[in-house]
């Protein structure tokens, strides 16, 4: 589940490739879906249309026949050396992945994992301690409004400009990065305890998972057992 996925992206030898995206998806989401939402054998992406529906059809995912080419471009963009700020580029990857909607289910979770994964690849391992899912969930209406605004602007101008999404992320997620997070001294003390053998690898994994998945949010032991496994 999610624990395996976080461990997978924490390993910097697991670079962002199409094959690794597929592996990450299967271990965190794909293997737990009902049959009708699973990927076909030998398929890395969905094999049919998908619609995001609210009170109406909010978004139609990219036609499935085009997904291999577009996902290859997305992965190439992730690997490309650019002068863009890493936080901005991570948010662009997040938007593009969810916009393409390569799966029948779990696209939002995968977009957030890809976001964190890219930051880890750029050397920001501390990103794994950020409860991004909670920040997005708490601003869900603004999250979807940003997507809608991008699409509406595209219909008018013919240009896909992700600025509204970047503004959303800067204000609603990145602005909160210092909120309720462990202080540097706390992290250093924990790492030292781990080196000295006072903390086991299992305890380390559990602590990292709690920080990433819940942040300062309250949770029950039952929920932790279900999520962490």
Predicted regions and their residues:
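FIC/Doc superfamily catalytic core
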Residues: 1-229
């Amino acid at each position: 589940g999610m624990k395996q996925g976080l461990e997978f992206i924490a390993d910097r030898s697991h670079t962002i490739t199409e094959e690794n995206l597929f592996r990450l998806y299967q271990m965190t989401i794909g293997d737990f879906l009902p049959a009708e939402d699973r990927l076909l054998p030998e398929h890395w992406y969905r094999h049919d249309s998908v619609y995001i529906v609210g009170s109406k059809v909010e978004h139609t995912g990219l036609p499935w026949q085009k997904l291999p080419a577009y996902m290859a471009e997305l992965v190439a963009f992730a690997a490309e050396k650019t002068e863009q700020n890493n936080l901005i580029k991570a948010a662009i990857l997040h938007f593009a992945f969810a916009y393409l909607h390569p799966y029948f289910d779990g696209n939002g979770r995968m977009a957030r994992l890809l976001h964190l994964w890219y930051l880890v690849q750029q050397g920001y391992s501390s990103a794994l301690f950020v409860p991004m899912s909670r920040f997005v969930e708490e601003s869900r209406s603004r999250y979807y409004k940003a997507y809608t605004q991008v699409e509406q602007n595209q219909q008018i101008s013919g240009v896909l400009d992700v600025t509204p999404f970047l503004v959303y992320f800067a204000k609603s997620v990145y602005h909160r990065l210092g909120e309720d997070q462990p202080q540097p001294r706390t992290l250093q003390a924990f790492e030292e305890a781990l080196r000295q053998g006072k903390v086991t690898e299992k305890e380390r994994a559990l602590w990292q998972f709690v920080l990433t998945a819940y942040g300062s949010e309250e949770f029950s032991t039952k929920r932790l057992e279900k999520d962490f496994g």
